Amino acid sequence: TANTVRGCIVAPPGKKLVIADLANIEGRGLAHLAGEVWKIQAFRDYDAGTWADLYKLAYARSFNTTPEAVTKGQRQIGKVMELGLGYEGGVAAFLTFAAVYQMDLDELAEAVWSTASEDALAAAQGMLEWVKKKRRSTFGLSDRVYVACEVLKAAWRKAHPMTCALWENVSTSVLLAIANPGETFRVRQLAIRVDG
């Protein structure tokens, strides 16, 4: 993926190509754009060496545990949550990232079902029933795995109210910009405009 693309990029003569991997740059940018204050502070604390990384924190917040108790495998679940759900991804996005990171979805489902609240499981089961009623795809997942992914999605969104509001506001502003060419619509630090 990234390494494959890097091999296609060559610096021009006299220039140097520098490769860098910025720690959770997607999450940092999104937290800043959305004004997700608790998360911005968590990044600051992580950078200062006084708090856990955000992948551990994502898992801990969803499974009602402490970041210190999060194992390497559990951190991977947190990573998938952060990367797959941050830009309005749902179960399908979670599934895609889980495949990339070779997660065992049955193990994931077991972890979720053994720790999630009855209310969270019931809400996710309700969403699954709605998806089936509307004849939408369940992506070949078992009901148990689908519900687990839905629980994680809902938990992530509950923990990120400013990010969810940003999605809604950007969507509305894009539609307004399309309907009103030449007019600029602002959402926090973003300016959305269609010309022509």
What does each model-found stretch correspond to?
Residues 1-196:
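Conserved catalytic core of nucleotide polymerization and phosphodiester-bond processing enzymes
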